[in-house]
């Protein structure tokens, strides 16, 4: 879910720095995006820029979205799963909120989102983007994409978005 995985992000950055790489750009999709956002917000990494795809807004909301997708009653089940999932994994899941982590992200950031994503709502995406404090933030939307790998399905458009973002960093 991206909570403890923030430490994995630190491990990767530490390795890259040890190998003398200085211009570190982090890329993450879904849970990976949330892990990057947490790692940056908790100041355990400081990349030069960030590229993220379809991060969820809050742990509670992402659980609710999945219950809705399965036509399972959201209340009280989503609350119980958020509570119990966090408890058995030794963290308070109600505080795992990438939309809050966004308030600490000052690096240039490209955020991509699929308009047909059933797991992450447009409202969550807009809130995250609004909360980003970066002066160089870009939101690209794929109108026909769901919660998926955009490169696989929209390769040329994805590559163009990445290239434009990276070229603007120079």
Task: For each feature predicted by the language model, list its residue ranges.
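Acidic catalytic loop of the alpha/beta-hydrolase fold
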Residues: 116-120, 148-149
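Alpha/beta-hydrolase fold nucleophile elbow
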Residues: 19-30
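Short alpha-helix in the alpha/beta-hydrolase fold that links the catalytic acid
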Residues: 107, 121-130
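Hydrolase active-site cap/lid region
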Residues: 38-92
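Glycine-rich nucleophile elbow surrounding the catalytic serine of serine-hydrolase chemistry
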Residues: 28-38
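Catalytic histidine-centered segment of alpha/beta-hydrolase-like enzymes
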Residues: 145-156
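Short beta-strand/loop motif that positions the catalytic acidic residue
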Residues: 105-106, 111-113, 117
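Alpha/beta-hydrolase active-site loop
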Residues: 1-19
